[in-house]
Amino acid sequence: MLHTFVAYVEDLPGVLTRVASLFRRLNININSLTVGRSERPGLSRLTLVCEASAEAGDRIRASLYKLENVVDVDDIAQAPSVTRELALIKVAATPRNRAQIFDLVEVFRARIVDLTSESLMIEMTGVESKIEGLIEVLREDEGRILEICRSGKMTMRRGHHVSSVVKAMGVGDAADEEMTVEESAADEV
């Protein structure tokens, strides 16, 4: 079962090491990890994706919450959410194949962010399968891909639901009361 944990952690040295050490101790591989500043100064938002049983997922969530400097944790894999990933893909581009690459970029709704006489860099944001699709097509021409950099998954719940940390800041209280029946039912699953 795939788990997507969203945690708010204090912006302090060693926090990421503690999180990674927990997964090492549990012998669970981290499939994706992103960390960045949140809407609250001094806190970062950590999104972590892993494969584990439902029972192990519950243990992971509880263990994450017990870690020093972890303020809030939620497993939102089953919740209605939006997940995106960013990829930068540098490809070899000659005048002969450049038009073909431009067409491919347009089909995948990506964009060119850097262009030289010998290469170009593609930026693409989307779901993992869409990014994998572009990479697969680019790999059909051996030697075309020079370098790939991917962000990892970023996930946020749909609708008005916000974490308890955001609620404590006074944001989203009224919005939570307006949650639709559909969102409420999805939260109970």
Where is each model-derived feature located?
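Long, contiguous binding/interaction regions
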Residues: 1-4, 8-45, 49-189
